Amino acid sequence: MKWIVIVAGLLSFHRNAQEQSLCYEISHEKLGIERSYLFGTMHAMEENSFFFPKRITKLLEKSDALCLEIKNITEVRIEPEMLYDTTLHLKAYCDSTEWSNLTIWAEEKLFMKPIQFEENFEHAKPFMLFQFILAMNLPANKKSHEQELEKIAASNKIQLLGLESVHEQLNIFNQIPFDDQMDMVFSELNNDEKNIKDFNEMQQAYRKQELNVICEYATNEKLDGNISLFLDDRNKKWIPKMKEMMKEECVFFAVGAGHLCGENGLISLLKKEGFNLKVIKL
């Protein structure tokens, strides 16, 4: 169920970036932190457009630990109650046209008849459906920075760490009213061509390491006023954890590129904590 966290990366693009790099060396003289790294990822990219410079491999191999947003995501068990609510009836949040559009989508993309779709999704929390639609708009042949980094870490016996749990990440959606979640569902469903186009343009910006372009992308429409939940609040929770990890060892942090951006992005927050960040050209 790896698709559960795709949204955390693809929706992690925010405004007001002032840096033009995806990778940074972190240090803090007073805390005795000589070296760690921060790398902004794109959780899913088309395989033939995948951007993974050799320098990233070298930097990780020089590190003691790899820290992702969530460690071992493919091995995490997700409890059904995190995805379903038996008191919820998804159909009640749709008018007849919207429900018809959903069943048409399910038949085309999931090969489910309307009755099958209703049986499987009637009690699903809307964000689960949203992430299915989002995942279906991604390329069939895709690669993930996180998977590649995990492979390198495993082959070099590098410790694997995480900044949050799957349950913490999924709980973000539980703080969003179902009506707002359904708005996200239909925004993704009704704009699939535009979203695919935006994804392709985002890939190109990522390959060029244009963090400012990535951070200006109109994904704010998808976040729909919930930027604090998806980005800012999480960044602020991560900073103390990152600081403690870096006191112990050299850590290679890899998080969605959007987490680097803006006044409440990791770059800015780390600087406010007295860290020095040195741009690394890839």
Enumerate the predicted regions with their spans.
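A cross-kingdom marker for long, charged
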Residues: 228-282
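Short secondary-structure boundary/capping elements
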Residues: 18, 48, 233-237
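Structured, acidic catalytic/metal-binding patches in enzyme active sites
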Residues: 26-37, 42-223, 229-230
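Short, well-ordered alpha-helical scaffold segments within catalytic/effector domains
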Residues: 4, 53, 235-239
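Bacterial Sec-dependent N-terminal signal peptides
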Residues: 1-25
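Short, glycine/serine-rich, charged loops/turns that create anion-binding
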Residues: 11, 43, 258-259
